[in-house]
Design a protein with these regions (language model features):
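Alpha/beta-hydrolase active-site loop
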Residues: 82-102
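Catalytic active-site module of serine/aspartate enzymes centered on a nucleophile-bearing elbow/loop
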Residues: 270-311
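Alpha/beta-hydrolase fold nucleophile elbow
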Residues: 105-116
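Active-site glycine-rich loops that stabilize anionic/oxyanionic intermediates
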Residues: 36-41, 116-117, 249-250
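Alpha/beta-hydrolase-fold enzymes
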Residues: 122-208
Length: 311
């Protein structure tokens, strides 16, 4: 049986603390997979995947990003990253967990999985710290139009001038998720997440999944997304790093696959060569709790096995 170890770690932001877990295999550890979770959720939602992989010799670790899960001081911290540069803080914290994990489990192949917002941070991470990885899985990602992201970022800055960076703007939130539930109206506002209605209801009943982002977090996230439109930044990614993109072909974040393919093409244009992708018919955004989640778990494990066979 694998075992979970909860841990805390000082954030790279003074005075803040990160909460995380490690799921340690009972037998020999073959590799490490670090997780970067999505927007308005928390790392413990990934425990089923962690157990599945740990039973196959993969140690899985991850933490709650700032403003998420247990990485808060009070509930007022929900949806707030950091000032003056929240995007940098989230990236630096991801790397701090990498450093800690490599100190505890040295000389092992090391992989990163990022979902949704966490996928955008994972893609930035690959450009800054990619040489510390043996591969990465990019899940539930997209490719937002540069002009729209710039407008959204400017709107955040204007609103913050009047209300401050802790302000929670319903306008920005509405614009960010506009159209995601199109064609699914009538039951909940979040059926775009998943075909499994019980999982959607569970998500909506969870306090850690229903807060509104602050202007600070939106501005930080938009800043990071804009970096992914910069060819010079993407060119910093190791060209031979193995990547696996996973997406539901009914995921609105990835524009039903079109945005995911644009993200892949942007990396190919930057010279990245080793990219695979899987699109799941009918699946929506949250693949790890979708109706075909065991298929997704198996594909992740199989891809990791393939990479380890090359080591």
């Amino acid at each position: 049986m694998s075992r979970f170890i909860d841990f805390t770690l000082p954030s790279t932001v003074p005075g803040r603390t990160l909460h995380g877990f490690r799921c340690v295999p009972e037998g020999p550890v073959r590799a490490v997979l670090q997780l970067s979770h999505g927007m308005v959720e928390y790392i413990d939602r990934y425990r089923p995947l962690a157990e599945y992989l740990a039973d196959r010799g993969i140690l899985v670790t991850g933490h709650d990003h700032l403003g998420h899960g247990a990485s808060i001081r009070t509930k007022e911290d929900y949806g707030y990253f950091a000032e003056p540069d929240g995007n940098r803080a989230v990236l630096a914290d991801l790397h701090a967990v990498t450093v800690l994990t490599k100190e505890l489990y040295p000389n092992l192949p090391y992989f990163l999985l990022g979902h949704s917002m966490g996928s955008f941070y994972a893609r930035q991470y690959l450009c800054e710290y990619g040489r510390e990885l043996n591969g990465a899985i990019i899940m539930g990602t997209g490719f937002q139009p540069k002009a729209l992201v710039k407008i959204a970022k400017t709107l955040c800055r204007v609103l913050a001038a009047f209300h401050g960076w802790h302000y929670r703007s319903n306008l920005v939130a509405s614009l960010s998720f506009m159209g995601y539930n199109k064609g699914l109206e009538g039951r909940t506002t979040h059926d775009w997440l998943n075909r499994d209605q019980a999982e959607v209801d569970k998500y909506l009943a969870e306090e850690r999944c229903t807060f509104t982002f602050t202007l600070n977090a939106y501005y930080s996230m938009f800043s990071g997304i804009l970096r992914l439109h910069d060819p010079a930044f993407l060119a910093r990614m190791p060209k031979d790093l193995p990547l696996l993109f996973l997406s539901g072909d009914a995921d609105p974040v990835g524009e039903q696959g079109k945005g995911v393919r644009r993200a892949i093409q942007s990396l190919k244009d930057a010279g990245v060569q080793n990219i695979e992708s899987i699109f799941y018919p009918g699946a929506r955004h949250e693949l790890l709790v979708e109706t075909n989640k065991l298929e997704v778990f198996g594909d992740i494990a199989a891809w990791l096995d393939k990479q380890l066979a090359k080591q």
